[in-house]
Amino acid sequence: MKEKINELAGRLLDLPDSILDLQMQLIDRSAELQKVESQIGERSSEIKYIINNALDDNGKKLYSNAELRDAAFISDAKDDILLPSLNVDRELIQSSIQSIRVKVENLSNHQRNIRVLISYLTTDSNIDNL
């Protein structure tokens, strides 16, 4: 039983480093997400600028109301080369962040469980049974 306690204690000592590694990955992925979201915002603004300044053959605004501009944005955003790619990148990064969060939560739960188990196994009433 002492071997099991030592094994659990060793695992307990290793878990903080594993959790820290994942948290650092989370920070990196969050920074990547911010960058991609910024790029999406910039590209969306560029598309909207073009739409807002589009003129017909008579020099009048091509999209005279918000509904037309919104429809043009949706259409142009779909046809854009960069924006769909950035949206896919954002979704992949968000999925990765969720996965890392689940792993951190799992390791944290594992850490708490080991602490409780070691505490239980090393109490005076239980140590006599070892």
Question: Where do the language-model regions lie?
Answer:
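Short A/G/S/P-biased low-complexity tracts
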Residues: L8, V116-S125
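Extended alpha-helical coiled-coil "stalk/arm" regions
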Residues: S30-A72
